[in-house]
Design a protein with these regions (language model features):
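Helix-rich C-terminal "cap"/substrate-channel and partner-interaction subdomain
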Residues: 1-91, 95-131
Length: 131
């Protein structure tokens, strides 16, 4: 059984204890465009980042982008965020929101804009400031 094999292997690396509060159903991050106005208002009161719409075409908020960056398997590229949360998938194809997504990634990673990549280490978005 896979569970026993995983526990046996992991216990060789570090102590493994049973989590009595384990929930086998993964509850994903909130998706604003699928919420009622009441639920959306509640979420924005709890975290104002959900009230900052970054992608108007797909109704993606700053909070949703930050959720993707903070996830257990983070996506620190513009295309990774696009695939996970959908900014840039709408009519404008990222013409308006891609610079904002890039800025949010740079702020979150605490790095200059020049270090944020489109999809891989070789996919440079900006080489430097022009002004």
């Amino acid at each position: 059984d896979i569970e026993k094999m995983a526990v046996d292997y992991l216990s060789t690396l570090k102590p493994v204890e049973k989590n009595e509060n384990y929930d086998p159903i993964r509850h994903g991050p909130p998706i604003l465009r699928e919420m009622s106005d009441e639920r959306r208002a509640t979420l924005i009161r709890q975290n104002p980042d959900y009230g900052i719409i970054i992608c108007r075409c797909e109704e993606v908020s700053k909070g949703e982008i930050l959720d993707a960056l903070r996830s257990p398997i983070p996506v620190p590229t513009v295309d990774g965020i696009k695939k996970r949360v959908r900014p840039g998938m709408g009519r404008c194809q990222g013409g308006f929101c891609s610079p904002l997504v890039t800025q949010i990634i740079a702020e979150y990673l605490d790095c200059p804009l020049e270090e944020v990549r489109k999809s891989s280490e070789q996919a440079v978005i900006t080489y430097g400031k022009t002004k």
